[in-house]
Swiss-Prot record:
GO terms for biological process: peptide catabolic process; proteolysis. SUPFAM superfamilies: Bacterial exopeptidase dimerisation domain, Zn-dependent exopeptidases. Its cofactor is Zn(2+). The keyword Hydrolase applies. This is Peptidase T.
Amino acid sequence: MSSVIERFLRYAAIDTQSNEESQTTPSTGKQLNLARLLEQELKELGLQDARIQEGYVYGTLPANSTKAIPAIGFIAHMDTSPDFSGTDVKAQLVENYDGQDILLNPEHNLVLSPADFPELLDYIGKTLITTDGTTLLGADDKAGIAEIMTAIAYLTAHPEIEHGTICVAFTPDEEIGRGADQFDVAGFGADFAYTVDGGSIGELEYENFNAAKAIVKVKGRNVHPGNAKNKMINSILLANEYIVKLPPQETPATTEGYEGFYHLNDIRGDVEETTLYYIIRDFAEDSFAKRKETMLNLAEECNKKYGSGHFHVEITDQYKNMKEKIQPVMHIVDKAQKAMETVGVKPLIKPIRGGTDGSRLSFMGLPTPNLFTGGHNYHGRYEFIPTFAMEKSVEVILKIIELYAEEHSN
């Protein structure tokens, strides 16, 4: 078993699920279990400044060259999504995949099928890592952590490879949008960085959604149902009216590429009050602004029908499209593309239909595009990752480092 696979399996077994309702940093104490392990492993690899700061793990591999090679950062996040259990992950290796259904869990008859996930057929003959069907896998983003750590281990074992300063960081709470909240850009010390938090092999991303969350509070009036005629106002039914007035063709399930959406991801309520939790996503700034305006205007429209105060919308921006911060330093994307091509990986440059720590870090002065990890179907029981893609990710990281050293050696 290659070292990147061994590392990933160890990291995946540690529960690091984040919690959006917590106000601490990190949002869950269990993320520190992985943080402490990574700090220790970085120190064992010779990164003597390895440290945990505000729940973030930082470390620096000093340059072994006197040339003016830029300091390059590599970043991954420790937490897993709160959308699905990350407790007691039991990863399974499927060797020499034959293109058929994979039985994840005989007891619950859970199957990972190419009929549902046709991308599986791209990996016939390869080794896959899957879940046992009861948890997510955590390749998002423990695969990225394993790939960065393996690359650092390779560099420390091969001091003959010339490189500049290499900065690594592992962040908490990326899955709940707080991964960059306490990130110490100045202390990190990189001129630019890459998050290793993408999907399938070859993905290279420097555009992402503009993102906001919207909380819609709907007020009703509860009265005993036995004498409720012309008195009761059921907030659940009012909330449903709001939901169905948003464009049904503009949801995650009906959009792709550069198309934006409204996503209702939680509802909590009763007759007296119902709360709708939305996320709003779009690539273009004008379209993004229009979506926010649509939600506010819809609340006004509903209030005109039912009376002032029944509907209230609160919108909070979360992150912006990093494209405007990456374009002035496109050499970092070009170098990653060349690195992939050099190691035999076809680059797939595409927009991120989501966000990474890099999107916010780019606006904090650290331009940070995103590299693939190799994983698929994040945030659920059908998550999987081909082992060869993880190995290629390590090669790409090392090649980026090598290319910058070569460029500044001439």
